């Protein structure tokens, strides 16, 4: 519904806020960054729909949070999520007379009287069989795959994802817009590294990894490459691994602790659970950051490390070359000896390390959520104008 204030047309946008209370995961970071930036557009009135059984963080000024109950709330977590996406949001949007629904993850409603824009963060479940192993997951994937085809507009967070979406969802590539992500503003050089080292029992110098532990993250490659370093170099630069597996399926979540013990390098590896607020300082205290993932939609951690002025070694798979350019040392994700060589070079060559720091800082500054929001706003306006033209 169009609202008028001081002669300005204002459009009502409803956003699926399922991940609003999950700011440490990629989609949650995207939603927070996007909504915060969109709130500065005077021609938008934004309503964020969140599940009724969550305690959502405060929204930016001008953004309304509406809590929606759905069938299965408080009973089945998975079914409650599906009903929230498929029934509660379209119904609320219709009652609220919104102009557009934006679903910022791969979870669009199959049927909606209100036009839907869907952002595709990645299509991992369609590309990698291990991620759709159960019947429930396969059924859900088929549902949202079909629903995505009904979206008025698809957005993708990288050209890599846009190409995947054209191939796997049947959309014309020219109809899919790319809206890049960005590192959150909290990721910048932090002077509190000494305090963080004490709190997390970190060594003076270290190699850092933070991210998922599922199989596509390929953490075992870095562990094996690290084990091949000379023992003196390992002692000088322990490997700090943050995060943990969130499942028990050994195919999806390889046992990296068993691998560490098997390789005899447990004394040189530190396992930590780091908070979001402390993560910038942990990045900043590292000699380098490693990211061996073999499949990503965007890959925020390397960009966060760059924003914190830390040298990055990453895989050259999927979107990594697109996002990181020549500001990171890019390596074949499965070539263990190449990873060992890359680690040796970066740790032993201060000039190379500083050049990566400088290039990375420039690269990270190329991305911002204000740019993401501007591209998203343009998509909103095109879809709304198209709907008005059909009326």
Task: Tell what function each PLM region has.
Residues 1-391:
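Carbohydrate transferase catalytic cores enriched for Leloir-type hexosyltransferases
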């Amino acid at each position: 519904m169009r609202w008028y204030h001081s002669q300005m047309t204002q459009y009502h946008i409803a956003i699926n806020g399922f991940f609003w209370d999950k700011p440490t995961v990629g989609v949650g970071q995207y939603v927070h960054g996007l909504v915060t930036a969109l709130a500065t557009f005077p021609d938008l009135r934004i309503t964020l729909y969140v599940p009724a059984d969550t305690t959502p963080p405060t929204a930016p000024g001008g953004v309304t949070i509406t809590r929606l109950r759905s069938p299965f709330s408080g009973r089945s977590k998975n079914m409650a999520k599906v009903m929230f996406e498929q029934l509660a949001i379209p119904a609320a949007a219709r009652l609220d007379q919104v102009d557009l629904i934006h679903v910022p993850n791969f979870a669009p409603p199959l049927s909606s009287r209100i036009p839907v824009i869907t952002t595709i963060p990645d299509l991992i479940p369609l590309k990698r069989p291990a991620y759709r192993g159960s019947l429930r997951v396969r059924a859900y994937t088929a549902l949202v795959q079909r629903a995505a085809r009904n979206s008025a507009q698809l957005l993708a967070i990288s050209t890599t994802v846009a190409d995947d979406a054209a191939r796997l969802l049947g959309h014309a590539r020219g109809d899919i817009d790319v809206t890049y992500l960005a590192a959150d503003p909290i990721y910048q050089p932090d002077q509190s590294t000494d305090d963080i080292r004490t709190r997390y029992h970190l060594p003076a110098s270290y190699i850092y990894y933070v991210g998922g532990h599922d199989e596509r993250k390929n953490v075992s490659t870095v562990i094996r490459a690290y084990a091949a370093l000379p023992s003196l170099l390992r002692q000088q630069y322990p490997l700090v691994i943050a995060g943990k597996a969130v499942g028990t399926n050994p195919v999806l979540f390889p046992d990296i602790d068993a691998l560490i013990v098997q390789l005899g390098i447990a004394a040189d590896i530190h396992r930590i659970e780091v908070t979001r607020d402390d993560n910038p300082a942990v990045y900043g205290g590292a000699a380098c950051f490693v990211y061996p993932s073999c499949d990503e939609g965007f890959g925020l951690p390397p960009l966060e490390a760059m924003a914190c002025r830390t040298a990055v070694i990453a895989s050259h798979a999927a979107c990594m070359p697109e996002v990181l350019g020549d500001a990171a040392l890019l390596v074949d994700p499965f070539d263990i000896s190449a990873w060992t060589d890359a680690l040796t070079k970066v740790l032993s060559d201060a000039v190379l390390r500083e050049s990566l720091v400088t290039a990375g800082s420039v690269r990270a500054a190329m991305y911002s959520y204000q740019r993401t929001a501007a591209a998203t706003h343009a998509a909103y306006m095109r879809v709304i104008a198209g709907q008005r033209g059909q009326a």
